Amino acid sequence: MAVAAAAMIGLPQAYLEGKEVKETSSLVTELCRHFYTQGWVSGTGGSITMKVHDASIPKPEQLIVMSPSGVQKERMQPEDMYILSANGSIISTPSPKPYPNKPPKCTDCAPLFMKAYEMRNAGAVIHSHGMESCLVTMLNPQAKEFRITHMEMIKGIQGHGYYDELVVPIIENTAYENELTDSLTKAIEAYPKATAVLVRNHGVYIWGDSWIHAKTQAECYHYLFDAAIKLHQLGLDAATPDHGPIRRTIHSQIKDSQYEREWPRRWIVLDIEGTTTPITFVTDVLFPYARENVGKHLNLTYHTAETQEDIKLLRAQVEEDLREGVTGAVPIPHADEGKEKVIAAMVSNVEAMIRADRKITALKELQGHIWRTGFECDELKAIVFEDVADALEKWHSSGIKVYIYSSGSRLAQKLLFGNTDYGDLRKYISGFFDTTIGNKKESRSYKEIKETLGVDDPAEIMFVTDVYQEAVAAKAAGLEAIISIRPGNAPLPENHGFKTVTSFSQI
């Protein structure tokens, strides 16, 4: 069977018996034994799969090694492994073993593993039945997500840092493993940043670019699940920055001269410019700093991966601008024309974009990297209105989760709130949204925020901004929109119909 199957996919039998496949099979065996000692694959449960790394074969076309089903994971041998083609077809089956061993069977997780390979270009996938991965889904039987923030091991999860909120989708268990395929697929689609999916009362699927990434993340996820369980036992909330007491129901009073009502507010989303921070700080301090230092920044960091990515993003934006006839856009030469020419064109485009106050991701990412240097060197200190720090602390202590939504990059937002004249305010903020989630003047962006937060009723989210068009978009998405009136803000249309505040103390 193995010879025929190998021939069908254009591989010689010798390859299936070669070094790469043998080493991968041995590694899967070794990891299964290790994870058995962790309690992740006991009682024949759980499973591991891994791509056969071969630099001569593109990753999507590499063979796959999968552990068998119903086998004592701590006693497995390399010859017990199944070998699959890149599309999931079995091309090598292990030989049967004498009684009391069961006939060989590929893991029931195979269809779910294939989804991680196909949809996330994974290099390895781990399915754990660790007790903490089961219990964490029971803390709130109605929850569709697991959330945790401000915990050290979050940094071990791809794309996350200490201040980020880690969100893992939870899907409902079924009687048979392969029946989870559709719900796992939907979860992977709905949570593009996630590298894991929890199955209620069952376990967790975790993937990574390689076996090292998958293993590292699995260890971090289990640590975080355990931390959340222990915090819950202490009556503390893992999803808030200071892990304060769990609050089951939160009610706040909104009062003004026109109405008074009780509103179960749990989420507040804040704009920055003209809402938490004076417009003049952005226009008179941040923008000039970026404009004056862009050339210096590009010269010093030109060969770094980060700056090369910034150049790539800006070049793509400029090409689009040139097609649309945007004023100030000039072509950015290819790298082989020399560093100096590339930087000169970059500077010219950045200056034009800043003058036009363009709200585009390519510019905002580069600005964030320039501002990072300014904050690190104490050349910049962020300014917030005097009522902001007290309000953030009050909302946080009340169990209300505060998020930021700004056209500035997430990095720039974190730098600003981490370096204010009132100290580091990030401890009061649960997360940050930027234009990668959508344009602030489009209602679908606010719908995406609602889905990301896992909120059923959008009216439970209050959005505060100084921009009328943003308030209109948020309201169209069902959010409670309030307009911030601050010194220097643009005038509002007459009869705009929105509640306004001049201070966060009025919220």
From Swiss-Prot:
<comment type="similarity">
    <text>In the N-terminal section; belongs to the aldolase class II family. MtnB subfamily.</text>
</comment>
<dbReference type="GO" id="GO:0046570">
    <property type="term" value="F:methylthioribulose 1-phosphate dehydratase activity"/>
</dbReference>
<feature type="binding site">
    <location>
        <position position="440"/>
    </location>
    <ligand>
        <name>substrate 2</name>
    </ligand>
</feature>
<dbReference type="InterPro" id="IPR027505">
    <property type="entry name" value="MtnB_viridiplantae"/>
</dbReference>
<comment type="similarity">
    <text>In the C-terminal section; belongs to the HAD-like hydrolase superfamily. MasA/MtnC family.</text>
</comment>
<keyword id="KW-0028">Amino-acid biosynthesis</keyword>
<feature type="active site" description="Proton donor/acceptor">
    <location>
        <position position="152"/>
    </location>
</feature>
<feature type="binding site">
    <location>
        <position position="129"/>
    </location>
    <ligand>
        <name>Zn(2+)</name>
    </ligand>
</feature>
<feature type="region of interest" description="Enolase-phosphatase E1">
    <location>
        <begin position="268"/>
        <end position="507"/>
    </location>
</feature>
<feature type="binding site">
    <location>
        <position position="202"/>
    </location>
    <ligand>
        <name>Zn(2+)</name>
    </ligand>
</feature>
<keyword id="KW-0862">Zinc</keyword>
<feature type="region of interest" description="Methylthioribulose-1-phosphate dehydratase">
    <location>
        <begin position="2"/>
        <end position="237"/>
    </location>
</feature>
<feature type="binding site">
    <location>
        <position position="109"/>
    </location>
    <ligand>
        <name>substrate 1</name>
    </ligand>
</feature>
<protein>
    <recommendedName>
        <fullName>Probable bifunctional methylthioribulose-1-phosphate dehydratase/enolase-phosphatase E1</fullName>
        <ecNumber>4.2.1.109</ecNumber>
        <ecNumber>3.1.3.77</ecNumber>
    </recommendedName>
</protein>
<comment type="pathway">
    <text>Amino-acid biosynthesis; L-methionine biosynthesis via salvage pathway; L-methionine from S-methyl-5-thio-alpha-D-ribose 1-phosphate: step 3/6.</text>
</comment>
<dbReference type="GO" id="GO:0009570">
    <property type="term" value="C:chloroplast stroma"/>
</dbReference>
<comment type="pathway">
    <text>Amino-acid biosynthesis; L-methionine biosynthesis via salvage pathway; L-methionine from S-methyl-5-thio-alpha-D-ribose 1-phosphate: step 2/6.</text>
</comment>
<dbReference type="InterPro" id="IPR036412">
    <property type="entry name" value="HAD-like_sf"/>
</dbReference>
<dbReference type="InterPro" id="IPR036409">
    <property type="entry name" value="Aldolase_II/adducin_N_sf"/>
</dbReference>
<keyword id="KW-0479">Metal-binding</keyword>
<keyword id="KW-0486">Methionine biosynthesis</keyword>
<dbReference type="GO" id="GO:0008270">
    <property type="term" value="F:zinc ion binding"/>
</dbReference>
<feature type="binding site">
    <location>
        <position position="273"/>
    </location>
    <ligand>
        <name>Mg(2+)</name>
    </ligand>
</feature>
<feature type="binding site">
    <location>
        <position position="271"/>
    </location>
    <ligand>
        <name>Mg(2+)</name>
    </ligand>
</feature>
<dbReference type="InterPro" id="IPR027514">
    <property type="entry name" value="Salvage_MtnB_euk"/>
</dbReference>
<dbReference type="GO" id="GO:0005829">
    <property type="term" value="C:cytosol"/>
</dbReference>
<dbReference type="GO" id="GO:0019509">
    <property type="term" value="P:L-methionine salvage from methylthioadenosine"/>
</dbReference>
<keyword id="KW-0007">Acetylation</keyword>
<dbReference type="GO" id="GO:0009536">
    <property type="term" value="C:plastid"/>
</dbReference>
<feature type="binding site">
    <location>
        <position position="127"/>
    </location>
    <ligand>
        <name>Zn(2+)</name>
    </ligand>
</feature>
<dbReference type="InterPro" id="IPR006439">
    <property type="entry name" value="HAD-SF_hydro_IA"/>
</dbReference>
<dbReference type="Pfam" id="PF00596">
    <property type="entry name" value="Aldolase_II"/>
</dbReference>
<dbReference type="InterPro" id="IPR023214">
    <property type="entry name" value="HAD_sf"/>
</dbReference>
<feature type="binding site">
    <location>
        <position position="466"/>
    </location>
    <ligand>
        <name>Mg(2+)</name>
    </ligand>
</feature>
<keyword id="KW-0378">Hydrolase</keyword>
<dbReference type="GO" id="GO:0009507">
    <property type="term" value="C:chloroplast"/>
</dbReference>
<keyword id="KW-0511">Multifunctional enzyme</keyword>
<dbReference type="GO" id="GO:0043874">
    <property type="term" value="F:acireductone synthase activity"/>
</dbReference>
<dbReference type="InterPro" id="IPR001303">
    <property type="entry name" value="Aldolase_II/adducin_N"/>
</dbReference>
<dbReference type="Pfam" id="PF00702">
    <property type="entry name" value="Hydrolase"/>
</dbReference>
<dbReference type="GO" id="GO:0000287">
    <property type="term" value="F:magnesium ion binding"/>
</dbReference>
<dbReference type="InterPro" id="IPR017714">
    <property type="entry name" value="MethylthioRu-1-P_deHdtase_MtnB"/>
</dbReference>
